[in-house]
Amino acid sequence: MSIHLRRLSTLFFVAFLWIGNLPAQDIGWQIGFHGFADNREYAKSGLYSQSILGMRIAPELIFSMDSAHFLHGGVNFLHEFGSVAAKDVVPTVYYNYRQQGHDFYIGMFPRKDLLAGYHRAILNDTLNYYRPNIEGLLWRYGNKIFRQQVWIDWTSRQTETEREQFMVGLSGRVNSGSLYLAHQITLWHDAGKKNNTDENETPVRDNGAAMLKIGIDLSELSFLDSLDISGGGIVSYDRLRSIYDWRTPKGVITDIYAEYRKIFIANTFYAGEGLDIAYGDRFYTSGLYDRLEIGWKPLQYKGLESQFTLSFHFTRGAVDNQQQFTLRYNIGKLYVTQR
């Protein structure tokens, strides 16, 4: 057993002893399965073509004193098809507070559902395969009209051999009838190694993006199950200290999503300057880009979600394609004790 897993086992053991001495608490469990097959044919655009196939399974135990305070402990296990052994096992341990519209997390907690609303231009979808957890804090507040969230994800702790890296984000939305105003902001900080004196070391980098969009949700006014149209502006910002100052390319971006009886069509169009966003989709480095998606959701039932998507990527002088199938299955139960 690795040192990392031994430490994790010790942490769970101490937590169980502590919980056992508490007054009556609710105990539960949940298991999340994520299977994915993503074939990317990007050669015509000069980007990296690859096939990503694998699965993740994430069992968790849940302890709760009441309806507001929750402690989760588990692991997230990745296996890529064709590999000899597991590529990655990461701990999932976090505290969650939920009450009166507030939702607070601290620890190592799943990014699914929390950052899923971020645009691919800012946070690419490959993160769902290889970085399932946020390591840090997240707070959000929401009601029918207003929602806002702020978070920090510590991606690398500074040591003698590793650089210090973290990302902070802010996002929100305000609704007024069918209209809405939404924003998304990120900043990634990449600093040097501890006690480093190497003159060839990459300088400190600050990189991020901000997007502001206005949209209209016409789902209730049409025969479709879902119809959403939005558009606005996006700017990226990047600097490499002592090398170059802030660079701020910008452009306009529009999104259309329509769904009817498990069949959907989505289109994203970007025009402007090439965006250099560290965690963003690399297609947006092109000054002109259009993404057309045609998809089908064959299985949708009680925690089971599946989706097949055929995507076409249009850049200047090139058309690439992508086929993606994902399946998520989440089950669980909380056993409530009488107090």
Descriptions of predicted regions:
Residues 103-173, 184:
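Surface-exposed coil loops of outer-membrane beta-barrel proteins
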Residues 1-30, 139, 321-339:
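Bacterial Sec-dependent N-terminal signal peptides
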Residues 62-68, 76, 87-103, 109-112, ...:
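Subset of outer-membrane beta-barrel
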Residues 53, 85-87, 131, 164, ...:
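Short, glycine/acidic-rich beta->alpha junctions
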Residues 24-98, 323-331, 338:
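Beta-barrel outer-membrane channel/assembly domains of diderm bacteria
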Residues 38-40, 113-117, 191-193:
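Short acidic/His/Gly/Ser-rich catalytic and metal-binding motifs that mark active-site loops
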Residues 43-47, 120-122, 196-199:
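Flexible, solvent-exposed loop segments that connect beta-strands
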Residues 54, 92, 143-161, 167-339:
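Exposed, low-structure sequence patches enriched in small/polar residues
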